[in-house]
Structures are given as C-alpha cells and as structure tokens.
C-alpha cells in the first residue's frame, strides 16, 4: 500500500481528484459487499486511460476494471493494485442516421438505465427491454446483457475499445459480427471471465447502438413496463447481483426453477440467502461477507448437481483478491 501510494501520489498522471487510496467498495457494488480497493482510479477521458495503462504496465502494477458494480462479487480482501472506473466516459450522442435507423454512441461509463431514459426522451426505440437494468453500458456489452429475450448485441453496430498491450497499448474499432457473440458471451471476455486487466485485454470504451424513430409515449410505456416488472419480481428488494446463474437450455428449465425444485429457496449461509421469492437471486440479507455469498453459491451448485446432474454456471464474476 505505502509503496503504491508513493508511486502514484507522486506521478502527475494520477492527478488529484482522479485517484483515491484504500477506497471502500461496498457503496459502489449492488451486493454492498467487499473489501477496499488499494487504489481507485477514474481517468478523465480515453487518452488519460491509455497513458495510465502504459504506466501501470511499465511499473508492473496490477490493474482491474469496475463498471456499474452490479455483476461482481468483490472479495472480503478487496483489490490489490489499481482498480479503474470508467465512470467519466459518460457521453451519449447521435452520430448518424440512415433511413429510419439512428446510430447512438454511449460511453462505457453511462449507466444502462440512464441510456434507456435518454432513448425515451429522444423518441428512439430499441432499448425498451433494458429499462431498469442496473449497471453500465461497458458492463452490459462485456457481459452481453440479456433481458426479456433480447441481448445487448442485438442492438450493436460497433464498439470502440482499447487493447491493453504494455507500451503498444492502442485504440481500436470493432464492427458487430453476430458470430462473435452468444448467450451472455462477448468477444471482449477472457476465459475465465475476470475483471483483471491482463495482456491483450480489450476494454470497451464506447458502443454504437442501432435504434429507430418511434412515438415517445409508446416507448416510455414499454420501458416503464420493464422497470415495474423488475420491481414486482423483487430485483431490488435486497442487495444482490440479480441473476446468480446463467440459464442453460440444455437443462430444460431456468436455473431459478431448478434451484426452487431442489428446495433451496430461503437457504442461508451466514448473512447470505437464496431469495425466498426467486431461486436465482442470492441476496445479502444480513450484512453478509463475500465468503458467505461464495459459499452459498457453491452449496447451490452442489445440491442442484446432486439432484439433477446439471452444473449451474455462475453469471456473477468473483472479483478482487480471493487468495
């Protein structure tokens, strides 16, 4: 900590107001769980991010990414090194039109819910199903978020990203190709999916979406329907990361139903609980630790596997220092 502080504190690149040391992360995640970041850095723009990535690589300082904090479980130890937030990449703009198509660029730091509200205000259709979705545009693209049978990739035209490669770190453009995408999978994920910025990591900076002109009132109604549906299903009743496990069509039933049929709704581990109202939500019920949540996830996996033969795949990313 002291060594990292002395390096970054005395480097003009990490100017005052863009970096915080030993930053508590609980308020920044939907789980309200996890240890601190040794350093949390918010670059002011894309060029600032590029300079920082080159500096961190040159000085062999580990780095990770955080988006909206809604699909991650931060370890109780938190993050070593520098955790980078792209919240300042928050611009939304129309960049072109073709017939009835409208091309909208949104920065990675834009909150998805803010983008859907912006689309309503500008009478643009195509994002209604993402109304009320927590998280950021960068995270939604990275995870290929899927809501009500529509994936974020279904609306993509192109993506600007940065390829992390030491002193060769550079900006690049990606044109949407459907063969690169799958159910909650994108060409920007590594295997295993991680928040860590490793060599050749592709970091989403902005995305261009293809939308269409529509009637503002109709778009607003459809968007609000999704918001209210999330509320009625208890998405926001307790701190959680939403769906804990991916669905798998080969299993014949949604993950939540498999968990419910295994008699696991309401099961507790420390302060963590399988939500009594939804089998696929694991919630922070009583000041749970990250270890409580992870242990409960593993218990659910084992029980469902023992009863059905199916191994549920977590959608939640285990982030930070789990050593």
From Swiss-Prot:
Protein location: Cytoplasm
Entry annotated with the keyword Methyltransferase: no
Similarity comment: family membership: Belongs to the MurB family.
KW Oxidoreductase (keyword) present: yes
Organism: Treponema denticola (strain ATCC 35405 / DSM 14222 / CIP 103919 / JCM 8153 / KCTC 15104)
E.C. designation(s): 1.3.1.98
InterPro entries listed in its UniProt record: FAD-bd_PCMH, FAD-bd_PCMH-like_sf, FAD-bd_PCMH_sub1, FAD-bd_PCMH_sub2, MurB, MurB_C, MurB_C_sf, Oxid_FAD_bind_N
Record's keyword terms, sorted: Cell cycle, Cell division, Cell shape, Cell wall biogenesis/degradation, Cytoplasm, FAD, Flavoprotein, NADP, Oxidoreductase, Peptidoglycan synthesis
Example GO molecular function: UDP-N-acetylmuramate dehydrogenase activity
Domain FAD-binding PCMH-type: 33-214
Residues the record marks as active site: 243 (proton donor), 315
The protein's name in its UniProt record: UDP-N-acetylenolpyruvoylglucosamine reductase
Lineage of origin: Bacteria, Pseudomonadati, Spirochaetota, Spirochaetia, Spirochaetales
Cofactor(s) listed in the protein's UniProt record: FAD
One annotated Gene Ontology cellular component of this protein: cytosol
Primary site of residence: cytoplasm
Pathway annotation: Cell wall biogenesis; peptidoglycan biosynthesis
Single GO biological process annotation from the record: cell wall organization
Catalytic activity of the protein: UDP-N-acetyl-alpha-D-muramate + NADP(+) = UDP-N-acetyl-3-O-(1-carboxyvinyl)-alpha-D-glucosamine + NADPH + H(+)
Function statement: Cell wall formation.
Pfam families hit by this protein: FAD_binding_4 (PF01565), MurB_C (PF02873)
């Amino acid at each position: 900590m002291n060594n990292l502080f002395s390096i970054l504190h005395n480097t003009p690149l990490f100017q005052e107001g863009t970096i915080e040391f030993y930053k508590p992360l609980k308020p920044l995640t939907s789980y309200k769980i996890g240890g601190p970041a040794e350093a949390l850095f918010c670059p002011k723009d894309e060029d600032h991010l590029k300079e920082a990535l080159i500096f961190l690589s040159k000085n062999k300082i580990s780095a990770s990414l955080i988006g909206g904090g809604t699909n991650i479980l931060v370890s109780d130890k938190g993050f070593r090194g520098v955790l980078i937030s792209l919240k300042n990449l928050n611009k939304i703009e129309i960049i072109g039109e073709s017939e009835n198509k409208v091309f909208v660029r949104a920065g990675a730091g834009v909150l998805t819910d803010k983008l859907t509200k912006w689309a309503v205000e500008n009478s643009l259709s195509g994002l209604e199903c993402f109304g009320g979705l927590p998280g950021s545009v960068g995270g939604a693209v990275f995870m290929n978020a899927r809501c009500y049978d529509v994936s974020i990739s279904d609306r993509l035209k192109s993506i600007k990203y940065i390829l992390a490669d030491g002193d060769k770190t550079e900006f690049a453009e990606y044109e949407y190709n459907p063969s690169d995408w799958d159910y909650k999978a994108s060409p920007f994920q590594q295997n295993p999916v991680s928040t860590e910025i490793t060599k050749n990591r592709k970091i989403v900076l902005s995305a261009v979406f293809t939308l269409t002109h529509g009637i503002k009132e109709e778009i607003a109604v459809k968007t609000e329907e999704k918001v209210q549906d999330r509320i009625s299903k208890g998405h926001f009743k307790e701190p959680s990361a939403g769906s804990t496990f991916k669905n798998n069509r080969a299993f014949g039933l949604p993950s939540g139903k498999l968990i419910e049929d295994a008699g696991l709704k309401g099961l507790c581990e420390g302060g963590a609980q399988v939500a009594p109202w939804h089998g696929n939500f694991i919630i922070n019920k009583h000041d749970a630790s990250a270890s409580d949540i992870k242990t409960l996830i593993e218990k659910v996996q084992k029980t469902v596997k023992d009863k059905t033969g199916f191994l549920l795949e977590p959608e939640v990313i285990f982030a930070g220092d789990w050593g």
